[in-house]
Design a protein with these regions (language model features):
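A structural boundary/capping signal
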Residues: 14-336
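Bacterial N-terminal signal peptides
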Residues: 1-12
Length: 336
């Protein structure tokens, strides 16, 4: 298999420490909460991840043609299906999907997919959309595993999403056990490799916040977190909190959603108090109560995540990741 380890510590954006640049606000035909309710209902009804992801993406960018994106995915799945030999097991079928995505051939119309080296920290929400990935053929640790899962489901594989700190990958059921598939490098990895590379604590493993195969509901929460990213810069922070509460009702262990809650309270604190600078006039009793409430809730949600085993991303990991990107880019330039 090709590629290097490309699990960016910010690919699944850690809401408290990085922010996508603001984009133009687009009027939505549906409220964020209504969208979330519809998406979670789709999961309960057994809809596949492709339909759920495209519904989320449509909220992010209303210009997206849902039918066109789903048609492209169906066509890809059918091309792969023609190459699956009779009796192929789960890992053999998975390998064919990875080959279709990564190896240049007439089979995939010479259109290979690769990691987006221009957005190594996944800061641009647009780059996490399936429509963007299908158009540019460059993805990240959100769009790449979701497309892999979408194709796997359409080909009858028992697949699901799983997470590591700030990262999403795929698990496939093979001979009664779950195997990890790393979509950003088109290969397989062990749980221990993920633990080492992303510094997963024993406490996090004990609390099962990472590496576990996610249910259909839990996978839909991972996909829907993009709506929280959208609301961070274009919506009200209270709406962001309401959406986060709805997602936590589906996956109480979603650390990423907890971080969004903590960050939303920080933004409220910043907007209502910190941005106004020091004042010679003391805060009113009501304002002081509000200030303390926002401060307390901000700390509570980050403390909640930490109590389950989440740890703040390490700056030295970010630096090593950027060095990996530079080496990868240099290698591509030499060979290209």
């Amino acid at each position: 298999m090709i590629g290097i380890w490309l699990a960016s510590l910010a690919c699944q954006t850690t809401a408290a420490y990085s922010a996508a640049p603001p984009s133009a606000t687009v009027l939505q035909a549906e409220t964020p909460l209504a969208t979330i309710d519809r998406i979670l209902l789709m999961a309960d009804q057994g809809r596949d991840i492709a339909a759920i992801k495209v519904a989320v993406d449509k909220f992010i960018d209303p210009r997206i043609n849902e039918a066109s994106v789903l048609r492209q995915i169906n066509e890809m799945a059918e091309r792969i299906r023609t190459k699956i030999p009779h009796g192929a097991d789960a890992m053999e079928r998975t390998a064919l999907i990875l080959k279709y995505l990564s190896e240049d051939s007439e089979w995939n119309q010479h259109q290979t997919f690769s990691y987006d080296l221009d957005d190594p920290f996944g800061t641009k929400l647009e780059n996490k959309l399936l429509s963007t990935y299908l158009r540019t053929r460059r993805g990240n640790c959100v769009s790449m595993p979701i497309l892999l899962l979408a194709l796997g489901q359409k080909l009858g594989l028992e697949m699901t999403l799983a997470t590591a700190p700030s990262h999403v990958f795929v698990k496939v059921r093979h001979n009664g056990t779950w195997k990890n598939v790393e979509a950003t490098s088109f290969g397989v990895m062990t749980d221990e490799s993920y633990r080492t590379k992303t510094h997963i604590s024993d406490l996090a493993i004990a609390n099962q916040i990472y590496l576990r195969p996610l249910s259909r509901r839990e996978s839909s929460v991972v996909v829907a977190e993009a709506i929280l990213e959208k609301l961070k810069t274009t919506g009200s922070q209270q709406t962001r909190l309401d959406v986060a509460d709805k997602l936590l009702s589906y996956d109480p262990k979603s650390v990423q959603t907890m971080l969004h809650k903590g960050n939303a309270y920080f933004h409220m604190l910043k907007n209502e108090f910190l941005d106004h600078g020091p004042s010679s006039t003391p805060l009113s009793t009501q304002s002081m109560l509000r200030y303390r409430h926002l401060q307390r809730e901000n700390r509570r949600w980050f403390s909640r995540a930490e109590s389950l085993g989440w740890r703040e991303p390490r700056t030295d990991d970010d630096q090593r990741y950027l060095e990996d990107i530079r080496r990868k880019r240099g290698s591509l330039e030499e060979n290209g």
